[in-house]
């Protein structure tokens, strides 16, 4: 019986942890072509703030260097006022 109750408690803890995790994993934007073996994090940080990161994505680009992709925290959603 102790094993069954501990399994139930662990399951509940696991579900609560997932319920408390923030769902927003961030936003992405492409900033144009980037040179091979160069980081584009500086461009991303200048555009989206200090917490942004950038990388060259070679899988979607038609240019030889790749496409600069930025990952940054999404701005908060502002609710619209109702016009009723």
UniProtKB/Swiss-Prot annotation:
Cell compartment(s), UniProt: Secreted
Record has Disulfide bond as a keyword: yes
Pfam family, one: AtDEF-like
Position of the signal peptide: 1-23
Gene Ontology cellular component terms for the protein in this record: extracellular region
Annotated disulfide bonds: 27-74, 34-56, 40-68, 44-70
A GO BP entry: killing of cells of another organism
InterPro entries: DEFL, LCR
UniProt keyword terms in alphabetical order: Antimicrobial, Disulfide bond, Fungicide, Plant defense, Secreted, Signal
The UniProt record lists the keyword Signal: yes
Family to which the UniProt record says this protein belongs: Belongs to the DEFL family.
Record PANTHER family: DEFENSIN-LIKE PROTEIN 172 (PTHR36788:SF5), DEFENSIN-LIKE PROTEIN 183 (PTHR36788)
Protein name: Defensin-like protein 172
Organism name: Arabidopsis thaliana
Lineage, highest ranks first: Eukaryota, Viridiplantae, Streptophyta, Embryophyta, Tracheophyta
């Amino acid at each position: 019986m102790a094993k069954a109750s501990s399994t139930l408690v662990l399951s509940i803890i696991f579900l609560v942890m997932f319920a408390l995790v923030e769902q927003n994993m961030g936003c992405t934007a492409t900033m144009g072509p980037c040179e091979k073996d160069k980081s584009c994090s500086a461009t991303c940080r200048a555009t989206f703030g200090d917490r942004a990161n950038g990388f060259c994505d070679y899988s979607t680009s038609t240019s030889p260097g790749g496409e600069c992709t930025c990952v940054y925290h999404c701005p908060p959603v502002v609710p619209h006022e109702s016009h009723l």
